[in-house]
């Protein structure tokens, strides 16, 4: 009550914002005569003047009135179109990091040119985001003449474009593209192996068209780049053949023991290790199978993956037993859960182990699609420094825009008053009665010459209506969002007298339905039309336009209510553009999904009490209110789901940003030798500590285990036991220092063979490749954790907190694994000639190219888990700042340890 009184006195927040902006509109209007006096050259020179003023420290807000006045005057000269005052307000809203709700037909595309120009003056790039490729191309080409007149470059970012073309598109002042492509390019840039492979600049300003569709409807849809693992089934089969030739020995080879076998097994760690004898035999057998060349070593850089295959095959034969660890059913290897004994359909072991077991069991070897990178739209768009959007329907979702994206919604008034008649809903008992009533309504209105747009919630429903219209002999067009270019043509002509068009809710968004049809489309069919022909077409169109207005304008028929009021409002918004006449009505039945689930009992009882007969409809404000309440319930539930998903996904997002920041830092430096030395020290300290605990008695030392570990994991022959026997004074610290120094000397000798430059490149390549590999495995592990985390609720634990805690532990473990695997790989690679390193780099490049060709870009509807304030991309993290991964530790004590 009090709030209502205050609102009446002071106006709503929306009213106050519009009042403030109208003052700026007055300033722009006063500048108009001054701009009209300028020559084209003087008007174009304003762009350079604005840029100079920005460099001198003037703010964009100060420049706004002049910049908008320049764009308006340029638009008059280039397009013959003048921005309305409400479009200037829309442009200001978009510049202020807000959502502008502008009704259909109010000229959102022209409005967007204002903030796009203003923000492009910074030289940091403006990304205009559309829902499909057709609209991106259309808007870019339509607005290109205006921007180029003003001295700005325009780029189009489309799927399938080569990297140089994409780089050029992103280098433009204003880039048009789809939400999918911007997101995928971000992910691909964070998989690049050199700075030159990246295409995007730092993310500055995103202007999102149909913002409700992208930031709300698709919020639960992660962008996923998955690479089908290379088809190496033949290799698995060939390697599998050599395993029966190998003999097991009980103990690992050491200084005091040399067995006759070819491999030993560590049951506890579930690992297998080849002996020297085994290595020689495996190499011989691989040469015999034609997998390896004569004289090659299994440990040479180019054969690292082959060694991986041999180890996987050995583990499959020795450590994994049929009907214990797995079963074979219908030609498929299915894992058995070791704790429950239940089969785990759909789960697969990673690292090629599952394929090795399939080769062992002689069943079809399946390739796996591995998730290499993923991000949700929610988290991608929060990376932009400035984010704004526009749509015809945002007010119903204003709370979600505010709470998740920190974006306020401002309803921009229409240029002319809206006079569309929104008729009350009609509710029927059955679906068939409803369809019959719709057909009758269409018959009556099309005879009068009124155009009709029938909106359905699915392609299936549109086919039902289409079939009924065919049966009634009514000519019509069907749209179902498959062919965007053709769709726009049909929508443009849907305003012809008596035209009947069926469309799914999203089809044709972005294209206005012009009453009387589009005269521009008719002109486009003529070759080199002259002014007289254009005038004739316009005159004929004016007659048709007036006739359609007289018939009542465009009539919208909704065949059922959508879960979201916003989608219903979008459908209604196709009619009544720019103050035109129009009408709308929704036809419902008790068999509709929404009515059946949420409103059935109350409305059914009401209909029964009224004694309704077949074919009769109920039309009452109570019914409309009951339906609106049902929709609010669904919207609230969907919002809660999206909010909860975002809370979970923010954990992964913090980790993603940490990894991508480190990855980009790695890419941008040529020498990471200091980092390698630092993590080598950490790795050797941790390794030695696990066998020689700090400040422990010698009786507690496992010297033999340490020697084996150094040999197996780092290819270092160090007689630690002999040193201790010969030098009794050798204590824990001096021993640790000696091992580290000897490891360093061995590494430096390798470096002398190939040269420091080649070694630096190799270190960087190994670091990037290992990081990518572990991140990929971490994504899969996070996914598995997320799928089962809700069960913690039964143990009276908060699943969100448990997920955060465990995922951080997994992240910390991944960083430790990264250090260990990088040092292990660099230590084990046997380098003889610089050419071998180059061969490995070439192999890596070929693998990256293969992946780029095979990349499957998939939109995967998933309850992926994701809120929070907008992430400020590229802020330098101080060493004493809180770690961005959410652990609560300082950066230097968490994943910043890699930056030592």
Curated annotation (Swiss-Prot):
One of its GO terms (biological process) is protein targeting. Induction: Repressed under conditions of excess protein secretion capacity and derepressed when protein secretion becomes limiting. This is regulated by SecM. Monomer and homodimer. Part of the essential Sec protein translocation apparatus which comprises SecA, SecYEG and auxiliary proteins SecDF-YajC and YidC. The keyword ATP-binding applies. Its EC number is 7.4.2.8. Keywords: ATP-binding, Cell inner membrane, Cell membrane, Cytoplasm, Membrane, Metal-binding, Nucleotide-binding, Protein transport, Translocase, Translocation, Transport, Zinc. GO terms for cellular component: cell envelope Sec protein transport complex; cytosol; plasma membrane. PROSITE patterns: SECA, SECA_MOTOR_DEAD. It holds the Pfam family SecA_DEAD. The gene is secA. Belongs to the SecA family. Zn(2+) binds at residues 883, 885, 894-895. Residues 842-852 have a biased composition (Basic and acidic residues). SUPFAM superfamilies: Helical scaffold and wing domains of SecA, P-loop containing nucleoside triphosphate hydrolases, Pre-protein crosslinking domain of SecA. Residues 889-900 have a biased composition (Basic residues). It is found in: Cell inner membrane; Cytoplasm. May bind 1 zinc ion per subunit. Residues 842-900 are annotated as: Disordered. The keyword Metal-binding applies. Its cofactor is Zn(2+). It comes from the Bacteria. Part of the Sec protein translocase complex. Interacts with the SecYEG preprotein conducting channel. Has a central role in coupling the hydrolysis of ATP to the transfer of proteins into and across the cell membrane, serving both as a receptor for the preprotein-SecB complex and as an ATP-driven molecular motor driving the stepwise translocation of polypeptide chains across the membrane. It is a peripheral membrane protein. This is Protein translocase subunit SecA. It comes from Pectobacterium carotovorum subsp. carotovorum (strain PC1). GO terms for molecular function: ATP binding; metal ion binding; protein-exporting ATPase activity. ATP binds at residues 87, 105-109, 512.
